[in-house]
Curated annotation (Swiss-Prot):
[2Fe-2S] cluster binds at C329. The modification N6-(pyridoxal phosphate)lysine is found at K205. Catalyzes the removal of elemental sulfur from cysteine to produce alanine. Participates in the biosynthesis of metalloclusters by providing the inorganic sulfur required for Fe-S core formation. One acceptor is Whib3, on which this enzyme assembles a 4Fe-4S cluster. It can use both L-cysteine and L-selenocysteine as substrates. The gene is iscS. The lineage of its organism: Bacteria, Bacillati, Actinomycetota, Actinomycetes, Mycobacteriales. The keyword Iron applies. This is IscS-like cysteine desulfurase. Pfam families: Aminotran_5. Pyridoxal 5'-phosphate binds at G68, T69, N154, Q182, A202, G203, H204, T240. IscU is absent from the mycobacterial ISC operon. The keyword Chaperone does not apply.
Length: 393
């Protein structure tokens, strides 16, 4: 089997599994005052310190959550509510149409239920957005509560100009959040230097366990909690913390960040070999997303015209190649990718797209296997699409 779906989830690092298992053999609520509780508290604070160190944050800025979706919801809704409460005229969110649904659906929920307004930044054909467009949006509206722009796109791998955009947001006094879930372990991140107010990360995207993430939140940024209870995590995210998962995520973060330069160079070579092979061996195919250096090292996203992505996906799966038609959070939904549509791709082409994403366990044999199977699978999927089109007439 060749696993080419690292953008959906990554295999856990063995060291992260071992670190989690060691904690799971112990007991103790990190909020308890007895010996076991203090031991649990020490472990989670050490995990917090390690994650902060690797991502350029202060330990007090790391708020543990149950994953990337919660982190995005907490940032978008919580910061919006806080800004609106402090300045009632601020009811606008500026974001992009290529965000993950955790951000998009949070924004749309605020529009539908809280009377929020939204300004969508224009998307270029390669999936990028510009700091100039953000400046124009903020100059046009004095009611902006929050800017939210992802650091790197989860489908096509385009890296967005977060440093430049955060400077613009700061100039206008507007807090900015970034979904950096795809960026950890693939790009050098420094939360403190980024100028961001908040940043979302998820453990399972860089070799940690699923079900745990973090929101990095500056101390001077107010965020209304989604949940109420024991007041853990700066009274922003109540609930008994999952110490083992936090430790596993911290261990994975250390491995991913410390090995980032070497791993990115290795993945870039594998990805380029994959891209060159696909473009050479298959007709009527295009690579979606930005070129280097504004593309994640492990991402290759193609449109195979004349076939359905889901059909192609299943043909590949039957031959031992595991990949995706897009975000795993929307897989199985018979709709073209909202990211590709925002990039100007027509619906039919968008439905014929595949994402092949590499990660820390990827090797040359995975690329070889994909290149061996893909041409035949594409040809078969195209024949099936032609037959289906003929039968429907």
């Amino acid at each position: 089997m060749a696993y080419l779906d690292h953008a959906a989830t990554t295999p856990m690092h063995p060291a992260a599994i071992e670190a989690m298992a060691a904690v799971q053999r112990t007991i103790g609520n990190a909020s308890s005052l007895h010996t076991s509780g203090r031991s649990a508290r020490r472990r989670i604070e050490e995990a917090r310190e390690l994650i902060a160190d690797k991502l350029g944050a202060r330990p007090s800025e790391v708020i543990f959550t149950a994953g990337g979706t919660e982190s995005d919801n907490l940032a978008v809704k919580g910061i919006y509510w806080a800004r609106r409460d402090a300045e009632p005229h601020r009811r606008r969110i500026v974001t992009t149409e290529v965000e993950h649904h955790a951000v998009l659906d949070s924004v749309n929920w605020l529009v539908e239920h809280e009377g929020a307004h939204v300004t969508w930044l224009p998307t270029a054909a390669d999936g990028s957005v510009s700091a100039t467009a953000l400046r124009e949006a903020l100059q046009s509206h004095d009611d902006v509560a929050l800017v939210s722009v992802m650091w790197a796109n989860n489908e096509v791998g385009t890296i967005l100009p977060i440093a430049e955009m955060s400077v613009v947001a700061m100039e206008f006094g507007v807090p900015m959040h970034s979904d950096a879930i795809q960026a950890v372990g693939q790009l050098p991140l420094d939360f403190g230097a980024s100028g961001l107010s908040a940043m979302s990360v998820a453990g399972h995207k860089f070799g940690g366990p699923p079900g745990v993430g973090a929101l990095l939140l500056r101390r001077d940024v107010t965020c209304v909690p989604l949940m109420h209870g024991g007041g853990q995590e700066r009274d922003i995210r109540s609930g008994t913390p999952d110490v083992a998962s936090a430790v596993g995520m911290a261990t994975a973060a250390q491995i991913a960040v410390d090995g980032l330069e070497e791993n990115s160079a290795r993945l870039r070579l594998l990805r380029d070999r994959l891209v060159e092979g696909v473009l050479a061996e298959i007709d009527d195919v295009c690579l979606n997303g930005a070129d280097d250096p504004m593309r994640l090292a492990g991402n290759a996203h193609f449109t195979f015209r004349g076939c359905e992505g889901d059909a192609l996906l299943m043909l590949l799966d039957a031959n031992g190649i595991e990949c995706s038609t897009g975000s795993a959070c929307t897989a199985g939904v018979a709709q073209p990718s909202h990211v590709l549509i925002a990039m100007g791709v027509d619906a039919a082409s968008a439905r014929g797209s595949l994402r092949l994403s590499l990660g820390h366990t990827s090797v040359e044999a995975d690329v070889d296997a994909a290149l061996e199977v893909l041409p035949g699978a594409v040809a078969r999927a195209r024949r099936a699409a032609l037959a289906a089109a003929g039968a429907s007439r």
